[in-house]
Amino acid sequence: MAKNKKNKIRGSKRGDELIGTSGRDIVNGRGGDDVITTYEGNDKIKGGNGDDVITSGTGKDKVWGQGGADIFVTENGTSNDPKKGYVKIMDFDRDDKIEFCGCASAKLEQRGKNVWLVKGDDVKAVIKGVDADDLEINFTERFVAFAVDPLA
């Protein structure tokens, strides 16, 4: 399949398992608790309403979890080149989590209005429109989430 071809994959209003291709995918989970996996290509993924698990592969992917408590998984690269891509999370909110390797070399960096999740010199995720001070990185449970406000 040509890498520049766009493949449209659409779920239902119920929970679906949606699997992308090695090309450029446009995935819309629509409703329900979806499990979405993409591979190579610069993909655009929308989870829709529901608590979705979105695993993006190599390429520079743009992801919207939309409604629900979504989990974004960053470790689905199929390439031997770890710098080949990253996921750009467009709407990270309080109920969402990013699952990552849990490596001690991972860190959060504020770059302008975005936070970058970096492992060594490899960018794993760009989180749009959030402040690094509002996030916590948990190496034991291998996730990044909004910090819990102890006064709330």
Predicted regions and their residues:
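Low-complexity acidic/polar repeat-biased segments
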Residues: M1-N7, A104, E109-A152
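Acidic, glycine-rich calcium-binding repeat modules characteristic of RTX/beta-roll
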Residues: R10, G15-S105, Q110
